[in-house]
Amino acid sequence: MQSIKYKRVMLKISGEALAGTNGYGIDFEVANRIAKEIKEIVDLGIEVGAVVGGGNIWRGRNGKGMDRTTADYMGMLATCINALALQDSLENMDVDTRVQTAIEMKQVAEPFIRRRAMRHLEKGRVVIFAGGTGNPYFSTDTTAALRAAEIEADVILLAKKVDGVYDKDPHKYDDAIKFDNLTYMEVLEKNLQVMDSTATSLCMDNNIPIIVFGLDVSGNIRKAVLGEKIGTIVSK
């Protein structure tokens, strides 16, 4: 059996990834594929926390003329919808899963309580953190960094639509250069689109490495936790 490099991981999945090729809403084939990949690493004994974005349902910046705070709260609720969808896919595969929300909705999910989240992880349950940080003006990238620090995750697995970090958008520019390794400071100084600056700074302050990889290739999550060379690694 291959050695496991990371025992406890924080998986960040963008809302757009859940939408698949539709670009909007939830593609349950994609949700089931992601759930299958999560199950693979849970079966290895890895403890998994997850944060799902909400961009497939609502983006705060789309609310033109809308109060920013209201738009952000709508985005937080969108992440809850995605979290419940992913929970359903995981539980259909017999993976014990809990959703914890930063905004209380007790009939739907548990409130975020750090000690309870840690206990779930220790028992082998997947914990999906929804509702952002519970505060407007903070992205789900920042949520992932914050929760990763709180649960003492070994790494953040940043699953995206591209297979790593580039100096410019590889979908638009054929000459885009991919980075294999970056430091936190390089990401901040070059303004590379890994995570937003708040999230990157939080990871830097708590020395949490970030692995950026493409979600469209099956088996990438497993490869990442086993320490195989994949995507881009951001660290000290």
From Swiss-Prot:
Subunit-structure text: Homohexamer.
Family in the record: Belongs to the UMP kinase family.
Superkingdom of source: Bacteria
InterPro entries linked: AceGlu_kinase-like_sf, Asp/Glu/Uridylate_kinase, Glu/AcGlu_kinase, Uridylate_kinase, Uridylate_kinase_bac
Keyword Nucleotide-binding: yes
NCBIfam families on file: pyrH_bact
CDD domains: AAK_UMPK-PyrH-Ec
Lineage summary: Bacteria, Bacillati, Bacillota, Clostridia, Eubacteriales
Pathways per UniProt: Pyrimidine metabolism; CTP biosynthesis via de novo pathway; UDP from UMP (UMPK route): step 1/1
A Gene Ontology molecular function term of the record: ATP binding
Stretches the record annotates as Involved in allosteric activation by GTP: 20-25
Source organism (scientific name): Clostridium acetobutylicum (strain ATCC 824 / DSM 792 / JCM 1419 / IAM 19013 / LMG 5710 / NBRC 13948 / NRRL B-527 / VKM B-1787 / 2291 / W)
Listed name of the protein: Uridylate kinase
Regulation affecting activity: Allosterically activated by GTP. Inhibited by UTP.
Pfam families assigned: AA_kinase
Keywords of the record: Allosteric enzyme, ATP-binding, Cytoplasm, Kinase, Nucleotide-binding, Pyrimidine biosynthesis, Transferase
Annotated binding of UMP, by residue: 54, 72, 133-140
Keyword NADP recorded: no
Reactions performed catalytically: UMP + ATP = UDP + ADP
